[in-house]
Amino acid sequence: MKKKFICFAILILTAYILLYPADAVNASRNGLMLWYEKVLPTLLPFAIISNVLIHSGYMDALTKHLTKYFRFFMPVSGEGVFILCSGFLFGFPMGSKNCAELLKANKIHPKEAEILFYITNNISPVFIGSYILLQQLQLTGMFGISIFILYVPALILGMLLLYRKKEENRQKKTASQSQITFKIIDAAIMNGFETLVRIGGYIMLFSILISLVEKLPLPKPVLILLENVLEITNGINCLANTDWSIQTKYILAMTATAFGGLSGIAQTSSMVKGTSLSMKKYCLVKLFLTLCTFLLAVAVSVFLF
């Protein structure tokens, strides 16, 4: 069934490119420009630095002092601290990428990696504050509460799951030697570019798919919701240009941001390929956290707008 659906989707996408080549090329260009101007310069440096830290052994030195403070509210290892910081500060898909990298290197227990994988693959606070709130919704003074309703459900779920994790399941580590060589740096650069090129490919494909969806004879509200389900950057832009109330725009924008779009799920799947991390469970948790954010956004809109 899955293979048939994928084959059908490929045929539809190919037919659209052949029938509407100008629109498809324009959508592809827009997607690649978004990747080149926004995603590549933001994520590539950190992708390279993350790989260097993980494979050189310096990550332990960086996180050992932070671990004791994190354990007051979340029982994580030093590697878990690194995943939490990278996932929440630098945003999607660094959380899932670092979970996969540490798991492949056998530097984190699979159970801890699985839990952190569920909760750290979020949209970055910079994107939320600058693009969504200021550029699109033109809302000032909403950054703090927006971060709260997007991140707190994930953090609470993470605390509950990590506290349930049995102590004996913790990974026993031996001290790793810290060294940085040109071989490690070269490998980190190649890994970073491979990761970002893969992300760029998904952004391009989903940009073409959104262009296809816009030609469907569907009511405008349905089209806007569908675009947000597919990819949030273009989806939230379309949402912001409607004449809907600011309450409705805010609720839907926060809900779409929590979900991350099918494009985000596809990119996440490519990051964790070859590991034991379950995409099925990830999607279920993502839907649950999206529902929590939706309810919190409704409550916020009632009291603040």
Predicted feature residues:
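Core transmembrane alpha-helical segments of multi-pass membrane transporters/permeases
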Residues: 7-9, 31, 35-55, 184-212
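Short, membrane-interfacial amphipathic segments enriched in basic
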Residues: 18-25, 173-186
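Structural signal for alpha-helical transmembrane segments and their membrane-water exit/capping regions
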Residues: 5-24, 47-57, 160-164, 207-218, ...
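Alpha-helical transmembrane segments in multi-pass membrane proteins
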Residues: 42, 46, 50, 67, ...
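Juxtamembrane and boundary regions of transmembrane helices in multi-pass small-molecule transporters
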Residues: 2, 134-176, 270-305
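Alpha-helical membrane segments and immediately flanking helix-loop junctions
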Residues: 73-137, 226-275
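Transmembrane helical segments that form the transport core of multi-pass membrane transport proteins
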Residues: 185, 189-257
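Membrane-interface helix termini and inter-helical loops of multi-pass transporters
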Residues: 22-33, 138, 219-220
